[in-house]
Amino acid sequence: MPFLSMIIAAAGRGRRLGREVNKVFLPLAGKPMLAYSLAVAVASPLVDEIIIVTRPDDIPLCRQVVAGEGAGKVKAIVAGGAERQDSIAEGLKAVARAAEWVAVHDGARPFLTPALLEKTILAARNTGAAIAALPVKETIKQGGEAGIVAATLDRKGLWSAQTPQVFRREWLVDAYREAAEKGWQATDDAALVERLGYPVKLVPGEETNIKITTPGDLVLAGALLAGEK
């Protein structure tokens, strides 16, 4: 089986949640948010090692979460950078030399399912890169000056990116090297890989695979967990 390293991004703050604490350690139904996706990664036979990237001050707390999950697959807990892109770059440095594939997942997406992780990994093996994503359903407006609508975009063919995102290791390493050299900035890893011309497969994501960003997301997360019981 090809060796796969999974990087879990857990270095964010909770400013939009109205909190300064790292949101991935906020409790959801009595467990830290990070614990949910970590448990899926630990249980997956397709994941060989896990790298968690978090804020330097949160490394002790992250170790507690890892210990609570009995996560023997966790190879390293790495101090992240100022931005998400910087954090993933640090995580890549800790990936095992044997790794042929790298998956990246947001720790603030606690509802990752084994099925979504598996199908994204398998799709990447066919094309070299794959990401979970959902077709855009809402009408998309482009804003202009003073909050006036500048244009209505055709949503046909538009997808909203999620994680996990899975790549050939050398593709992702190349993309991050180019980004560092040329000053590229992106809000997801696929955008950097795309800039090098590599094909990225869209894998239908899941509506429940939400990213916890706002207080409303926390309410929705609680409802989703209550519905699972």
From Swiss-Prot:
Family matches, as InterPro entries: IspD (IPR001228), IspD/TarI (IPR034683), IspD/TarI_cytidylyltransf_bact (IPR050088), Nucleotide-diphossugar_trans (IPR029044)
ATP-binding listed as a keyword: no
Enzyme Commission identifier(s): 2.7.7.60
Site-annotated residues for Transition state stabilizer: R16, K23
Site positions (Positions MEP for the nucleophilic attack): R155, K211
Catalyzed reaction equations: 2-C-methyl-D-erythritol 4-phosphate + CTP + H(+) = 4-CDP-2-C-methyl-D-erythritol + diphosphate
GO MF terms, alphabetically ordered: 2-C-methyl-D-erythritol 4-phosphate cytidylyltransferase activity
GO biological process, any: isopentenyl diphosphate biosynthetic process, methylerythritol 4-phosphate pathway
Annotated pathway: Isoprenoid biosynthesis; isopentenyl diphosphate biosynthesis via DXP pathway; isopentenyl diphosphate from 1-deoxy-D-xylulose 5-phosphate: step 2/6
Keyword annotations from UniProtKB, A to Z: Isoprene biosynthesis, Nucleotidyltransferase, Transferase
Enzyme class, spelled out: transferase
SUPFAM superfamilies listed in its UniProt record: Nucleotide-diphospho-sugar transferases
PANTHER family per UniProt: 2-C-METHYL-D-ERYTHRITOL 4-PHOSPHATE CYTIDYLYLTRANSFERASE, CHLOROPLASTIC
Family: Belongs to the IspD/TarI cytidylyltransferase family. IspD subfamily.
UniProt cross-references to HAMAP family, sorted A to Z: IspD
Record function comment: Catalyzes the formation of 4-diphosphocytidyl-2-C-methyl-D-erythritol from CTP and 2-C-methyl-D-erythritol 4-phosphate (MEP).
Protein name: 2-C-methyl-D-erythritol 4-phosphate cytidylyltransferase
